[in-house]
Amino acid sequence: MSKIIGIDLGTTNSAVAVLEGGEAKIIPNPEGARTTPSVVGFKNGERQVGEVAKRAAITNPNTISSIKRHMGTNYKETIEGKDYSPQEISAIILQYLKSYAEDYLGETVDKAVITVPAYFNDAQRQATKDAGKIAGLEVERIINEPTAAALAYGMDKTETDQTILVFDLGGGTFDVSILELGDGVFEVHSTAGDNELGGDDFDKKIIDYLVAEFKKDNGIDLSQDKMALQRLKDAAEKAKKDLSGVTSTQISLPFITAGEAGPLHLEVTLTRAKFDELTHDLVERTIAPTRQALKDANLSASDIDQVILVGGSTRIPAVQETIKKELGKEPHKGVNPDEVVAMGAAIQGGVITGDVKDVVLLDVTPLSLGIETMGGVMTTLIERNTTIPTSKSQTFSTAADNQPAVDIHVLQGERPMAKDNKTLGRFQLADIPPAPRGIPQIEVSFDIDKNGIVTVRAKDLGTGKEQNIVIKSSSGLTDEEIEKMVQDAEANAEEDKKNKENAELRNNADQLVFTVDKTLKELEGKVEEEEVKKAEAARDELQEALKGEDFEAIKEKTESLNEIVQNLSVKLYEQAAAEQQAAGGAEGQEAPQNDDVVDAEFEEVNDDDKENK
């Protein structure tokens, strides 16, 4: 069975891992880094992904980052006149991860386990699966990030039973999961979180502070200047990271903008104390989900054996201090917060292929599922933190006499009223025979698969008529749309490959022109003038072709010039060899005389030496 890669598709950074020799290994990207920025840029019809796109963001307005925050919504990015859904942008990132994983493994990769925040709803999970499909990946499993982290942490600790709390604060989302580990079973007891809390929010607090300080000093609002804002974003992220290791950092942005008197510079010293003050409310927001997870698992802080930190934002000292204070124990520092999720996904891939044995993963659904019933109430069928896969049925009836159809409004959430919860989808069970209200028996069944994706079925028990849907949110893509996006992605991959080949062809042609000029100088007076003119004409033709975009012509002229230069070089070497041979022959005739003279003199000198001795 082909290898299944594990992908952590993050808000700010992504990573890919594979199981090798029973161990999960992070695959470095072409730049040698172990994580790749989740950034996509479009420039002159070309796509850039990762560090290249992130570096160019200051000057390229067509740069997209943190797209994960829009997964499962109708959000669209319009770039160069074309609309892109979050699934398509995510697919571009996945395609890039897939391509360098293939280069590393030396084989085609078409299967993956992709992680999502535990608190992702059905629409967000479905969107992630669609992104994988667009990227040319068969998504074998969608796995929760904290669960993946627990897998990576607990693989070598299966002998002892322990309860662990995974605290996952990434670039855009926050999750807390509590798991029981023992005898190779990883059982999730509860999960809670906040999909709108992450490192991006900490960065924004610094940006807002810098904008306010600059406005106070100079009367100019930098938030209206796109280029300045991008520079502030990069500086804020760097300052945040610096303050995890030092207590004060200097933010210096020369020529950030211009005033009436000329260029203006931003110089601010940010202390850790000020950063903690700015982000205090964000850190506080991690406490409620942590307490909720403990409550749902019927545990207290003292029942937790180990606290695992996941996500780059857990490096913030105030975050670590809050966890320590809340749970009364030092967090475990033995895992890399940026890599552990991808490694866990790779291990899950190994479980699927059978390379990892004696491991059972029991995850839960993060939010309750139900339908809207009379009075706009949400009636829950599956409670949150129910182990998945699972299914549940309940019988309902009509609300009016002779009601011909029932609308099934599928909901996900914890609020008592339907309008306050997330709509997953709607469908209708029609052709119900006329009957007084309360008589027809309508059975509604919910199924949640191992990926946390929901199927709902409604059946009229009287007629046996049935209707079912795999939930597609309002943002969900149809099979036709996905197929079109798959084709677009494949075409783009081909185009990217072609662009790379064309760039290499152009570089080789440029190099050849340079080499020819050098060679012709060396050949002056050594080969016939006619041969030199022929080479110069071919060189000029290639230079002319290089001014255009006809790559077939460039290729043809390059090959033609190459052939002429090779023939010239052969003639030069033949001529040099002939000259050497002629010189060698002349030396051969003179050599005996010279040898006699030298030998005679040498003999005499030696004799004199002997006599002197």
Curated annotation (Swiss-Prot):
It comes from the Bacteria. SUPFAM superfamilies: Actin-like ATPase domain, Heat shock protein 70kD (HSP70), C-terminal subdomain, Heat shock protein 70kD (HSP70), peptide-binding domain. The keyword Lipoprotein does not apply. Residues 578-613 are annotated as: Disordered. GO terms for molecular function: ATP binding; ATP-dependent protein folding chaperone; unfolded protein binding. Gene3D superfamilies: 1.20.1270.10, 3.30.420.40, Actin, Chain A, domain 4, Substrate Binding Domain Of DNAk, Chain A, domain 1. Coiled coil: none annotated. Residues 578-591 have a biased composition (Low complexity). Residues 596-613 have a biased composition (Acidic residues). The keyword Lyase does not apply. Keywords: ATP-binding, Chaperone, Nucleotide-binding, Phosphoprotein, Stress response. NCBIfam families: PRK00290.1, prok_dnaK. Belongs to the heat shock protein 70 family. This is Chaperone protein DnaK.
